[in-house]
Design a protein with these regions (language model features):
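Structure-specific nucleic-acid interaction/processing domains
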Residues: 1-144
Length: 144
């Protein structure tokens, strides 16, 4: 599978089922880092078929292969030093929106991005509810 400019961490694999991933971008010149998330798929609402009432929901691939970041500061550094001076690394793949939000926050807190100068993350922002039952089962299975 074509990954664009992204590299995979050891043991990480992107498949057609992947909903999104948590990533680390590091500037090789300055050592500055950024942890974020990106969805690989986006939902599209389509009109109902003739005679039906419910909208159809489809998905399409997002721009993840060329995506750099939502951080303006990081994008300015990429313009200044060039994309080739940055490492774009996928840390974890997720199969749901809930898991993607959870693991982005977990990675940011574990790395103390708000306390360390080398990180460009200026805010940890998330709206996340209780874990769906399926996610809880996966979490407990993987944490043993």
């Amino acid at each position: 599978m074509d990954l664009g400019h992204w590299t995979l961490s050891e043991g990480v694999e992107i498949t057609d089922e992947t909903f999104g991933f948590v990533y680390l971008i590091e500037c090789k010149t300055t050592g500055k880092k950024y942890i974020g998330k990106k969805q690989c798929k986006s939902r599209i609402k389509r009109k109902p078929l003739k005679g039906k009432k419910r909208n159809r929901i489809d998905s399409k691939e997002s721009d993840w292969k060329t995506y750099t970041s939502s951080s303006n500061e990081l994008n300015e550094l990429i313009k200044k030093y060039g994309k080739e001076n940055f490492e774009f690394k996928i840390l974890k793949v997720c199969d749901s929106k809930w898991a993607l939000a959870y693991y982005e926050i977990k990675e940011q807190i574990d790395n103390e991005v708000l306390f360390k100068e080398e990180y460009l993350n200026g805010i940890i922002n998330c709206r996340i509810g209780n874990a769906p039952k399926l996610e809880m089962e996966k979490y407990h299975k993987n944490s043993k």
